[in-house]
From Swiss-Prot:
Protein name: Protein lev-9
Site (Cleavage): 575-576
Disulfide bonds, paired cysteine numbers: 19-49, 35-47, 41-57, 64-105, 91-118, 124-171, 154-188, 193-233, 219-246, 251-291, 277-304, 309-349, 335-362, 366-409, 395-420, 425-467, 452-481, 486-543, 529-556
Protein's organism: Caenorhabditis elegans
Residue stretches making up the WAP domain: 17-61
Glycosylated residues, chain numbering: 411
Gene: lev-9
UniProt-annotated location(s): Synapse; Secreted
Gene Ontology cellular component annotations, sorted alphabetically: extracellular space; synapse
Residues cleaved off as propeptide: 576-622
Source lineage: Eukaryota, Metazoa, Ecdysozoa, Nematoda, Chromadorea
Amino acid sequence: MRFLLLLAISITYASALSCPEVTLSQRPKHCKKECIADEDCKRNKRCMCDGECGLSCVNPIAMCHPLPNIENGFIRTAGDLRFGSNAEYGCNKGYILVGASQRRCQANKEWSSSQPVCRLQLKCGPPPEIPFAVHDGSSFSGEYDLDAEVAYNCIPGYHKFNAKGLSISKCLLNRKNVAQWFGPDLRCKARACPDPGDIENGLREGDTFEYPHHVKYSCNPGFLLVGSTSRQCSSNGEWTNEPANCKATECSRPSSPLHGKVVGSSLTYQSVVTYSCDHGYRLVGQVQRICLAEGIWGGNEPRCEEIRCSVLPTLPNGYIEGSETSFGAVAVFRCLETMTHEGASKAKCMEDGQWSAPIPRCLASCRVPHIQNGKIRDKSEGQLIASGSKVIVECNKQHEANIDERLICSNSTWSHVPVCSPLSCHNWPPRVPHARILFSKSSHGSIAKYECNNGYHPNRNNQIIKCLYGEWTKDGPPMKCLPSWCEHPSKTYGTLPGGQILLEGILGAYEFQSYIQKVEEGRAISFQCGKGNYLIGPPKATCVNGEWMPKVSPKCVSQTHPMIEGKILWDRKKRSLPGRAVREYVDDELSTHRQHSGKCGIVSGKLERMIMQHSDNGVSVC
């Protein structure tokens, strides 16, 4: 498919170059739509040359029908029978072709012309063609009678190569009684010209010295060709035109620019000239130019223009003496009274068109500001201070500057104006043993609070300390954190009838004796009831910050059990019932007996009870 596409493209390109222009009236009826380019055609059609139809919209893969054989002849075709394919006809010996010798597959899928025929040759056809020669035959039909002769001669520019060769051809019958041309054996050869020679300081192109070939001449860089650039070997064996020569290139002498000059003595190829300007002028353009191979100076001619500096801007808080801007002019800068001059005092217009220095600054003075709770050292309020000067702020006693104490005057504006504020506390508040300090800032007026660690309590209610003018200050006696002790628990809970209070230690719990008056922070006591009693309230208490917690007083209450209807049969393996079975007999309304058993849980029957273990010597109903 790719091959067919390339074939179609090549055919289209060739068609556009060689296709005849056909008017609408000249186009045969079988022609397809006329076009100029592929865009004029639809679908898979392309704009291609269709013989006598000219450029037409055709299907490049259209196929023509196979050609029938020609009697006493043959047909040669190249490739398949697609559009544009040619069929060439020929006859066997003794026969001559009558009709078109070639036919072409057209866009309408038909072959051009009609089929030719081969008939017995009784006359000679056209005389044979001899390269670079012509004959004097004059038959308009292209057929010659027997014994007809034609003479050959070489065309101009060619000569007879074989001097003894026969230059005549004659129509005779061959052994098969078929008319045939015999002769000539003429050979024509192009006439030769003598060697044209080389060109000095140049190059010759072309090494064939025969008619009708050419030789071309060119010169080396720095030389110009004088004469014709080419010569042709003519039909008479001589070269046309006169020999050319290469002459060294020379540029014309350049003129000096106005207010300047040009330096350089040589004007030959690749010579260089240099331009310069008079004092007070500067060169605009190239400093140097070179003589090119074409005999002209490279680049454009420069010019000299007067050197001028830009007009200086106005000087705020000052003035400029001198208004000239030409080369060498001087401008003097002056500031008004009380202004500070910062920068150059004058500037000169230089050769590069720039001033030697930028304009200065005339800076206004600053007035000494009012400083609350302070002053400016060695200066009085409202006094003028020159721009660029530095002053120092001094704060009153027990005050400090909130930012840098050094002020700089810059063109009537101070770099900053600090505020003298009461001193901050730069040290931590005094440390108190067994306490921690809570505070977020240490500026004047800030407060800090003490909190005693666990097991300690403050010696006073006010636990606050305040920062005043750089010192941490507090009212009353010094803050202390004292150890916390709990008194005998009887003072909190009283006695525990039916039980006892135990003091817990590392090795266990023992009875809290009356002689123990204080217990340290974190110690614990437990409450325990005697047999037949159970505890109501907290089982333990802990000494926290000098108090027993929780403060709820426990009680020991004697145990009672409700009567259970029926009979309880004990499991005699053990007296207690920790998870053991118990059997209950319950009388129902029908005076029948049912036996139930189970662990502490629901016993089903007419009377429902929950039996649970409670003590070593009894059960109770839940």
